[in-house]
């Protein structure tokens, strides 16, 4: 989930509200480890959540049974208004009982300085998982500029930083409705232009098959836009580019660009989307719909391209569909070079989880965080990247984890699947943990099963096949997984995993960045959905002119320094791992 940037006024307000929150804050706070165990509602301020309100369903039952708590999710992404909710709660001195938010832009340091989050050190007796991943808390303390256990990052790991962290598939790569690709005759896809021709063939076939002219090859959404169109930034990763602010850096460090680079990766993809628009391949709802609406369309078979692994396959590929040879699969795009980030032992420190300073029953809250970093907690907080809980979804057989029939259903297509009453009842998808905060990397090794948390990589799953996978494998050099195909063709570009958070910006630069981001996002959408080349060129020119006028050179200098610092750290880690 991309964090939504805030407006210039709100950005300045953030600094002010954090400063006000710190007025009168003491350097130490009373420590009380006593807890009467009564049912409590825990307010979770969560910058990554896509749901707001009381946690429902099977995940709610697990938290209630284990800790006697109800989680009340407070989600800026749902509330809207950029960072207004963060600013309002910060100014009041109480973000929430548990806090999940970004460290970027100096926020971590400001939160600690303002006394809005608590040092968990006094509550760590018996908290073995927090101690196990102390590299993460220590790295966060450096970002905070003050010693203490202020929280942990997401996706912590015990695996090598030079090893691709994604497993069977990269996060960002082109997935297509393989059944319609088959009906088109498995055409070659040499480059992105040819890809559009293939998508046009597929769209024509799909519309005829479904008797619906509202089936589109491409459908987008705006929820995650920040420094640019998030959809485009994800597509840039198809070709080995990682995004940091306005900048893009190739995984091997050989190229750096920005959103304004003429004929750079960002503008090339915008041009590709524009061409798709003129070919009638783009859903006209793209500029107004949200993630949920897009997800529904994909689930119902109305979209033919998924630019990332966590959309098409888990939403559409049910067992019943795969048995008919129907579903999403990796496209054989010959020019793709998917970006891969190596495992990060310290975790991704762009976001963290910690305890709010005004929280009561802090010992219980620390126990919850400690548990979230345990194997049991990883499965319980699954949102599709790992198996769901043992007993509910899988069991150990002959020393190996094996999915149950229910586990297979929800792992591959969870829409509409009912949960057994003993696990809380309701629809599985409605009960998924709303935190959207993966604590341990899904492809790290569970010390209890000796396999990954991700069931796609379990031996019991890898040996399974179905008509969809068999047909895909037959036309992809016999590969059994996406990663096997990409690795065989030396397509994956790995950047060694290191924890990195961009340096703090001053308020003036933050305000400039907000203006630039708004201009870039607005012009990008207009360019992508333009109906003529002249209109596209006009929007790109206007985007460049506006961004330059707002001081883009300063932003570029800052972002280039950040990506080069990040790359230097990656190279150092890679060298040490040899």
Give the predicted meaning of each segment.
Residues 3-4, 8-11, 20-194, 243-248, ...:
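Conserved N-terminal structural module of periplasmic/extracytoplasmic solute-binding proteins
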Residues 25-27, 49-53, 79-83, 105-109, ...:
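Flexible loop/turn segments at secondary-structure boundaries
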Residues 38-42, 67-71, 92-97, 116-118, ...:
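Loop/turn elements at helix/coil->beta-strand transitions in domains of secreted/extracellular proteins
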Residues 48-55, 67, 158-175, 182-186, ...:
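Extracytoplasmic/periplasmic substrate-binding proteins
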Residues 121, 153-227, 251-293, 297, ...:
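Helix-loop-helix "hinge/cap" segment bordering the ligand-binding cleft or interdomain interface
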Residues 302-414:
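Structured mid-domain segments that build the active-site/substrate or prosthetic-cofactor binding neighborhood
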Residues 380-522:
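Conserved small-residue motifs centered on glycine
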């Amino acid at each position: 989930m991309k964090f939504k940037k805030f407006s210039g006024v709100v950005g300045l307000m953030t600094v002010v509200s954090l400063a006000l929150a710190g007025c009168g804050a003491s350097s130490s706070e009373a420590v009380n480890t006593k807890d009467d165990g009564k049912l409590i509602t825990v307010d979770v301020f969560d910058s990554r959540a896509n749901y707001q309100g009381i946690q429902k369903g099977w995940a709610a039952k697990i938290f209630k049974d284990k800790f006697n708590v109800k989680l009340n999710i407070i989600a800026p992404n749902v509330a809207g208004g950029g960072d207004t909710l963060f600013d309002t709660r910060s100014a009041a001195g109480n973000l929430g009982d548990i806090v999940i938010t970004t460290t970027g832009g100096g926020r971590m340091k400001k939160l600690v300085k303002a006394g809005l989050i608590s040092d968990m050190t006094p509550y760590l007796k018996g908290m073995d998982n927090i101690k196990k991943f102390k590299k993460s808390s220590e790295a966060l303390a450096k970002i905070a500029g003050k010693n203490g256990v202020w929280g942990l990052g997401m996706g912590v790991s015990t695996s090598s930083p030079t090893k691709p962290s994604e497993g069977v598939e990269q996060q960002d790569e082109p997935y297509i409705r393989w059944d319609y690709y088959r009906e088109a005759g498995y055409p070659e896809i040499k480059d992105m232009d040819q890809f559009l021709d293939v998508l046009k063939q597929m769209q024509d076939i799909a519309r005829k098959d479904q008797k619906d002219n509202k089936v589109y090859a491409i459908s987008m959404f705006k929820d995650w836009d920040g420094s640019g169109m998030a959809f485009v930034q994800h597509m840039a990763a198809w070709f080995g580019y990682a995004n940091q602010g306005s900048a893009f850096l190739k995984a091997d460090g050989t190229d750096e660009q920005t959103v304004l680079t003429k004929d750079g990766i960002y503008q090339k993809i915008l041009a590709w989307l524009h061409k798709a628009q003129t070919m009638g391949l783009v859903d006209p709802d793209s500029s107004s719909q949200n993630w949920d609406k897009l997800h529904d369309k994909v689930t119902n078979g109305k979209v033919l391209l998924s630019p990332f692994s966590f959309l098409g396959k888990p939403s559409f590929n049910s067992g019943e569909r795969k048995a008919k040879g129907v579903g999403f699969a990796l496209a054989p795009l010959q020019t793709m070079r998917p970006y891969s980030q190596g495992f990060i032992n310290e975790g991704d420190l762009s976001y963290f989880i910690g305890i709010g300073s005004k929280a009561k029953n802090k010992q219980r809250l620390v126990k919850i965080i400690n548990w979230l970093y345990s194997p049991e907690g990883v499965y319980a907080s699954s949102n599709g990247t790992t198996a769901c809980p043992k007993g509910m979804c899988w069991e150990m057989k002959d020393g190996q984890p094996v999915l149950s029939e229910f586990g297979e259903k929800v792992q591959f297509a969870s829409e509409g699947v009912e949960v057994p009453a003993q696990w809380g009842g309701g629809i599985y998808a409605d009960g998924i943990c709303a935190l959207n905060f993966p604590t341990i990397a899904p492809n790290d090794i569970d010390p209890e099963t000796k396999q990954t948390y991700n069931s796609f990589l379990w031996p019991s799953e890898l040996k399974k096949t179905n008509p969809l996978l068999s047909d895909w494998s037959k036309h992809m050099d016999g590969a059994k997984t996406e990663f096997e195909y990409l690795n065989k063709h030396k397509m994956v570009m790995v950047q060694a995993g290191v924890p990195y958070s961009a340096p703090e910006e001053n308020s003036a630069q933050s305000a400039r960045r907000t203006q630039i981001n708004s201009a870039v996002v607005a012009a990008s959408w207009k360019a992508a959905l333009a109906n003529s080349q002249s209109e596209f060129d006009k929007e790109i020119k206007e985007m460049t002119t506006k961004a330059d006028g707002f001081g883009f050179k300063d932003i570029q200098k800052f972002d280039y320094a950040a990506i080069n610092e990040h790359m230097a750290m990656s190279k150092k880690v890679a060298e040490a791992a040899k």
